[in-house]
Amino acid sequence: MANIKSSKKRSIQSEKKRKYNSSKKSMIRSFIKKVKNSILKKEKDTINNSFIEMQSILDRYAKKNLIHKNKASRLKSRLSKKIKFIFK
């Protein structure tokens, strides 16, 4: 346990940030699952809406360095390839 006041504050701040980051990463994973499930079910209506929403979220959190920008673009690229294959 921290004894110095500033280190106590820092540990509290890091715990808050850890909870925030984990919730946002969980949200990202759930949006990716939502898109993948709609791809598996071949629901063309929901695929576009959920994919656009997922792209926006990935870009937002890549910009804030919550996930790496290359990971965000890789996820978007892989899912867009699957979507293009369905719409053929």
From Swiss-Prot:
Binds directly to 16S ribosomal RNA. It comes from the Bacteria. GO terms for biological process: translation. It comes from Wigglesworthia glossinidia brevipalpis. Residues 1-26 are annotated as: Disordered. Belongs to the bacterial ribosomal protein bS20 family. Residues 1-22 have a biased composition (Basic residues). This is Small ribosomal subunit protein bS20. One of its GO terms (molecular function) is structural constituent of ribosome. Keywords: Ribonucleoprotein, Ribosomal protein, RNA-binding, rRNA-binding. The gene is rpsT. GO terms for cellular component: cytosol; small ribosomal subunit. The keyword RNA-binding applies.
